Design a protein with these regions (language model features):
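N-terminal capping/small domains of soluble enzymes
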Residues: 1-114, 155, 166, 174
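Non-globular sequence segments
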Residues: 92, 97, 103-176
Length: 177
Protein backbone atom coordinates (compact mmCIF):
# COMPACT_ATOMS: atom_id res chain seq x y z
CA UNK A 1 0.00 0.00 0.00
CA UNK A 2 2.82 2.42 0.85
CA UNK A 3 4.22 1.99 -2.67
CA UNK A 4 1.17 3.72 -4.08
CA UNK A 5 1.24 6.79 -1.84
CA UNK A 6 2.37 10.14 -3.30
CA UNK A 7 5.60 11.82 -2.14
CA UNK A 8 7.57 14.95 -2.93
CA UNK A 9 11.03 15.86 -4.11
CA UNK A 10 11.24 19.58 -3.42
CA UNK A 11 8.00 20.99 -4.80
CA UNK A 12 7.49 18.16 -7.33
CA UNK A 13 4.85 15.63 -6.33
CA UNK A 14 5.43 12.06 -7.49
CA UNK A 15 2.22 10.03 -7.80
CA UNK A 16 3.66 6.89 -6.18
CA UNK A 17 6.92 5.44 -4.91
CA UNK A 18 7.66 3.31 -7.95
CA UNK A 19 10.88 4.65 -9.47
CA UNK A 20 12.68 3.51 -12.60
CA UNK A 21 16.32 4.13 -11.73
CA UNK A 22 18.94 5.21 -14.27
CA UNK A 23 20.77 2.53 -16.22
CA UNK A 24 23.49 2.67 -18.83
CA UNK A 25 22.13 2.90 -22.34
CA UNK A 26 18.86 4.55 -21.33
CA UNK A 27 19.58 8.20 -22.09
CA UNK A 28 16.96 10.14 -24.03
CA UNK A 29 19.76 11.83 -25.94
CA UNK A 30 21.84 9.62 -28.23
CA UNK A 31 25.11 11.23 -27.16
CA UNK A 32 27.51 8.53 -28.38
CA UNK A 33 26.37 8.50 -32.01
CA UNK A 34 28.64 9.14 -34.99
CA UNK A 35 25.81 11.15 -36.55
CA UNK A 36 25.69 13.48 -33.54
CA UNK A 37 23.36 13.81 -30.61
CA UNK A 38 19.64 13.43 -31.15
CA UNK A 39 16.44 12.48 -29.38
CA UNK A 40 16.36 8.70 -28.87
CA UNK A 41 12.87 7.60 -29.91
CA UNK A 42 13.49 3.96 -28.91
CA UNK A 43 14.45 4.95 -25.36
CA UNK A 44 11.41 7.27 -25.28
CA UNK A 45 9.12 4.34 -26.18
CA UNK A 46 10.55 2.33 -23.30
CA UNK A 47 10.00 5.17 -20.82
CA UNK A 48 6.49 5.95 -22.04
CA UNK A 49 5.53 2.29 -21.71
CA UNK A 50 6.83 2.30 -18.11
CA UNK A 51 4.90 5.49 -17.35
CA UNK A 52 1.73 3.93 -18.80
CA UNK A 53 2.30 0.98 -16.47
CA UNK A 54 2.23 3.16 -13.34
CA UNK A 55 5.88 4.04 -12.77
CA UNK A 56 5.74 7.32 -10.83
CA UNK A 57 9.25 8.63 -11.49
CA UNK A 58 11.55 7.79 -14.38
CA UNK A 59 15.23 8.73 -14.31
CA UNK A 60 16.94 8.00 -17.65
CA UNK A 61 20.68 7.42 -17.95
CA UNK A 62 23.07 10.34 -18.10
CA UNK A 63 22.92 13.12 -20.66
CA UNK A 64 26.39 14.61 -21.18
CA UNK A 65 26.32 18.32 -21.98
CA UNK A 66 28.51 17.78 -25.04
CA UNK A 67 28.44 15.18 -27.81
CA UNK A 68 31.30 12.71 -27.70
CA UNK A 69 31.51 12.91 -31.49
CA UNK A 70 31.71 16.30 -33.23
CA UNK A 71 31.78 18.23 -29.92
CA UNK A 72 28.40 19.94 -30.23
CA UNK A 73 26.77 21.16 -27.01
CA UNK A 74 23.30 19.78 -26.20
CA UNK A 75 21.77 23.26 -26.05
CA UNK A 76 22.83 23.77 -29.69
CA UNK A 77 20.28 21.17 -30.85
CA UNK A 78 16.83 22.85 -30.67
CA UNK A 79 15.11 20.07 -32.65
CA UNK A 80 16.04 17.55 -29.96
CA UNK A 81 14.43 19.69 -27.26
CA UNK A 82 11.29 20.16 -29.37
CA UNK A 83 11.00 16.36 -29.53
CA UNK A 84 11.68 16.15 -25.79
CA UNK A 85 8.82 18.60 -25.11
CA UNK A 86 6.36 16.51 -27.15
CA UNK A 87 7.53 13.38 -25.33
CA UNK A 88 7.24 15.03 -21.90
CA UNK A 89 3.65 16.03 -22.68
CA UNK A 90 2.89 12.32 -23.25
CA UNK A 91 4.69 11.31 -20.04
CA UNK A 92 2.77 13.90 -18.02
CA UNK A 93 -0.57 12.61 -19.36
CA UNK A 94 0.14 9.40 -17.42
CA UNK A 95 0.77 11.33 -14.21
CA UNK A 96 4.43 10.26 -14.18
CA UNK A 97 7.46 12.52 -13.82
CA UNK A 98 10.78 12.20 -15.64
CA UNK A 99 14.02 13.78 -14.46
CA UNK A 100 16.84 14.41 -16.96
CA UNK A 101 20.34 13.76 -15.54
CA UNK A 102 22.77 16.26 -17.01
CA UNK A 103 26.47 15.53 -16.61
CA UNK A 104 29.55 17.61 -17.37
CA UNK A 105 31.16 14.57 -18.98
CA UNK A 106 33.20 11.55 -18.06
CA UNK A 107 36.65 12.92 -17.29
CA UNK A 108 38.93 10.28 -15.79
CA UNK A 109 36.04 7.76 -15.78
CA UNK A 110 35.60 7.85 -19.56
CA UNK A 111 35.78 4.28 -20.88
CA UNK A 112 38.94 4.12 -22.97
CA UNK A 113 38.53 1.64 -25.81
CA UNK A 114 41.36 -0.16 -27.59
CA UNK A 115 40.94 2.31 -30.45
CA UNK A 116 40.74 5.52 -28.38
CA UNK A 117 43.78 4.78 -26.20
CA UNK A 118 46.35 4.84 -29.02
CA UNK A 119 44.60 7.83 -30.66
CA UNK A 120 44.97 9.85 -27.48
CA UNK A 121 48.54 8.80 -26.71
CA UNK A 122 49.86 9.91 -30.12
CA UNK A 123 49.87 13.71 -30.48
CA UNK A 124 49.63 13.55 -34.27
CA UNK A 125 46.62 11.21 -34.43
CA UNK A 126 45.02 13.08 -31.53
CA UNK A 127 45.26 16.31 -33.56
CA UNK A 128 43.93 14.64 -36.72
CA UNK A 129 40.83 13.18 -35.05
CA UNK A 130 40.16 16.20 -32.80
CA UNK A 131 37.31 17.58 -34.99
CA UNK A 132 35.55 14.21 -34.73
CA UNK A 133 36.46 13.20 -31.18
CA UNK A 134 38.43 15.49 -28.89
CA UNK A 135 39.93 12.97 -26.48
CA UNK A 136 41.62 15.68 -24.41
CA UNK A 137 38.24 17.31 -23.82
CA UNK A 138 36.54 14.00 -23.02
CA UNK A 139 39.28 13.10 -20.52
CA UNK A 140 39.53 16.57 -18.92
CA UNK A 141 39.55 16.23 -15.13
CA UNK A 142 39.76 18.50 -12.07
CA UNK A 143 43.50 17.85 -11.98
CA UNK A 144 46.03 15.91 -14.04
CA UNK A 145 45.56 12.26 -13.07
CA UNK A 146 45.50 8.73 -14.52
CA UNK A 147 42.38 7.59 -16.36
CA UNK A 148 40.30 5.20 -14.24
CA UNK A 149 40.09 2.44 -16.87
CA UNK A 150 43.48 3.03 -18.52
CA UNK A 151 45.98 4.19 -15.86
CA UNK A 152 48.71 4.58 -18.49
CA UNK A 153 46.75 7.52 -19.96
CA UNK A 154 47.06 10.79 -18.08
CA UNK A 155 43.94 12.95 -18.11
CA UNK A 156 44.62 16.65 -18.63
CA UNK A 157 43.59 19.22 -16.05
CA UNK A 158 40.55 21.25 -17.08
CA UNK A 159 41.27 24.79 -18.16
CA UNK A 160 39.39 27.74 -16.69
CA UNK A 161 37.85 28.25 -20.14
CA UNK A 162 36.52 24.65 -20.13
CA UNK A 163 35.06 25.14 -16.65
CA UNK A 164 33.26 28.32 -17.75
CA UNK A 165 31.98 26.59 -20.91
CA UNK A 166 30.58 23.72 -18.81
CA UNK A 167 28.89 26.08 -16.35
CA UNK A 168 27.31 27.97 -19.27
CA UNK A 169 26.27 24.68 -20.93
CA UNK A 170 24.59 23.47 -17.71
CA UNK A 171 22.58 26.70 -17.53
CA UNK A 172 21.56 26.76 -21.20
CA UNK A 173 20.71 23.04 -21.32
CA UNK A 174 18.79 23.00 -18.03
CA UNK A 175 16.71 25.92 -19.27
CA UNK A 176 15.71 23.86 -22.34
CA UNK A 177 14.88 20.77 -20.28
Amino acid sequence: EALFTPWKIGNVEIKNRIVMCPMGGTSLFGWFELTGCGFDKEAAKLFLERAQNNVGLIIPGIAPLRDTFWGKWLWQNPKMFEELKEFMDEIHKTGAKLFIQLTAGMGRSWAITELVGPLHKNKITRAIVKPIIDTSHELASPSEQPARWAPDIICPEMTKEQIHEIIEAFAKTAKLC
